[in-house]
Amino acid sequence: MLDKIKWLHVEPSSRCNAHCPGCARNNQGFGTADNLIINDLNLERLETVVSKSPKLEHVIFCGNMGDPCASKMINQQLDIIFKRQNLSLQLHTNGSLRTEEWWSQLAKKFESRLEVWFAIDGLKDIHSFYRQGTNWDKIINNAKSFINSGGRALWQFIPFAHNEHQIKDCIKLSQNMGFAGFKFIKDARYSNNSYHYRTGKDLGIKPWSKQNETWIRKNNAYLNNIQDQKIVKTKIKKTDCVHMIFP
């Protein structure tokens, strides 16, 4: 089977600094799930899979149960991919981990072989309502450091009722910062319940108003009427929550 693999989805860690209500690693935001096992992907296991996949072209560092950058072995995990010069890497993160210098060095190291998706669900006053436990200023500074060092970054946005009024402003900011694209999540992790990660108070997070509207496929891009607004020059595509649909 490994000899046929061309792209590989990797979960580097089950650790995370965030407490997003829709994530399976916690109880709708308040406390971690009882069955959650905290660990990092074994380096030997990753090395074995990569080395035995001769047709492998693309690797995705993502996380259903954690953030890749929270891994205690992320540098070594990245090195395993880096030393295979034919591999490209897509890294998904909330962006609120590591230092600006770390992000700068990452961009310089991988150059065009790396694309980072920063999960930013609004401006400073709104973002952390869902992305609990993250720091918007730190995310923006890390993204700037990565982009300014030559890195290719995409702004990933989950639309909710509480942040949809900021979509246009987020698109503008992404363009001003030099993001290469703005990504909407197709099937967001909406849940019936959402709680504050410290108090357990009900947050009442709801889907956005256009959640049930039909999206139109055109030239391999999924577009809705937001694409028609003149301020949008960045191609907007939608993808599923584990990013299994690619441009």
Regions from the PLM with identified roles:
Residues M1-N26, E57-G63, V242-P247:
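N-terminal pre-triad scaffold of radical SAM enzymes
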Residues P21, P68-C69:
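A short, conserved beta-strand element in the Rossmann-like catalytic core
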